[in-house]
Amino acid sequence: MASFLQRLVDPRKNFLARMHMKSVSNRLRRYGLRYDDLYDPLYDLDIKEALNRLPREIVDARNQRLMRAMDLSMKHEYLPDNLQAVQTPFRSYLQDMLALVKRERAEREALGALPLYQRTIP
């Protein structure tokens, strides 16, 4: 059953998943965003912790992409075509650190240790 579900959502094997991925990619390119930019640190504290552990340059680039996207959205414009062509919406910068944070949290829970940071959503 699990292999069936994996095949169902794998863009390399499922036409509909491939079409959805292409649609999301086009929407992100219009504003110059990456998929990892869509994660909200106020919603999930693991994401907040992962962003705190990333180098400052990466976080600054993320904030700049988000500000540019909000500016373009409010102006009802898109990025110029030459800039859209060089965007990489599915290049991940957060997933590795997020996996590490989640693995550490799971290990702490398994050992019965106190969390490093409060795990409540504001």
Curated annotation (Swiss-Prot):
<keyword id="KW-0813">Transport</keyword>
<comment type="similarity">
    <text>Belongs to the UQCRB/QCR7 family.</text>
</comment>
<keyword id="KW-0999">Mitochondrion inner membrane</keyword>
<keyword id="KW-0679">Respiratory chain</keyword>
<protein>
    <recommendedName>
        <fullName>Cytochrome b-c1 complex subunit 7-2, mitochondrial</fullName>
    </recommendedName>
</protein>
<dbReference type="InterPro" id="IPR003197">
    <property type="entry name" value="QCR7"/>
</dbReference>
<dbReference type="GO" id="GO:0009536">
    <property type="term" value="C:plastid"/>
</dbReference>
<keyword id="KW-0472">Membrane</keyword>
<keyword id="KW-0249">Electron transport</keyword>
<dbReference type="GO" id="GO:0005739">
    <property type="term" value="C:mitochondrion"/>
</dbReference>
<keyword id="KW-0496">Mitochondrion</keyword>
<dbReference type="Pfam" id="PF02271">
    <property type="entry name" value="UCR_14kD"/>
</dbReference>
<dbReference type="InterPro" id="IPR036544">
    <property type="entry name" value="QCR7_sf"/>
</dbReference>
<comment type="function">
    <text>Component of the ubiquinol-cytochrome c oxidoreductase, a multisubunit transmembrane complex that is part of the mitochondrial electron transport chain which drives oxidative phosphorylation.</text>
</comment>
<dbReference type="GO" id="GO:0045275">
    <property type="term" value="C:respiratory chain complex III"/>
</dbReference>
<comment type="subunit">
    <text>Component of the ubiquinol-cytochrome c oxidoreductase (cytochrome b-c1 complex, complex III, CIII), a multisubunit enzyme composed of 10 subunits. The complex is composed of 3 respiratory subunits cytochrome b (MT-CYB), cytochrome c1 (CYC1-1 or CYC1-2) and Rieske protein (UCR1-1 or UCR1-2), 2 core protein subunits MPPalpha1 (or MPPalpha2) and MPPB, and 5 low-molecular weight protein subunits QCR7-1 (or QCR7-2), UCRQ-1 (or UCRQ-2), QCR9, UCRY and probably QCR6-1 (or QCR6-2).</text>
</comment>
<dbReference type="GO" id="GO:0005743">
    <property type="term" value="C:mitochondrial inner membrane"/>
</dbReference>
<dbReference type="GO" id="GO:0006122">
    <property type="term" value="P:mitochondrial electron transport, ubiquinol to cytochrome c"/>
</dbReference>
